[in-house]
């Protein structure tokens, strides 16, 4: 003789004897309510998937329609973030002040030896960019002469002269800019993970 299974109704929470092993509710009225509930949950799930897919399509479309200027700005932000993480707890390239990171506004800047205006082709070149205190970078116009002295100490005179003589044009496509941004974001995350 087969033992009858007992269950608890999913709708009214009353105990009942199951007629089938897959039975979920105790009566026809509860079955109608349970069916409506399941339909509602299925609709909500499909709506959520549709919204997620729509959001993904919209963000891809926004990324695709960015202008070159917007992409350059985003890449510059990624490069500067990398420089700040790389040079954290080092000394300012110009004056030797310790570079301590601050949460609000950042404790120091990513200063360019050859400025972005004078040498836009070197704006993403990491040997041209070093951690610099805000005083030197903003208030002393980059403190160029001291920056050069600090750069010679770090890289050597030959490399500094190569940077000064570099006039090669670099023309970046939108895909190149997106790739550069991904690379620098990845480098930043790697350094942050190593530091913990």
Give the ranges of each region predicted by the language model.
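Histidine-centered nuclease catalytic patch
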Residues: 93-129
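Short, surface-exposed acidic
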Residues: 155-165
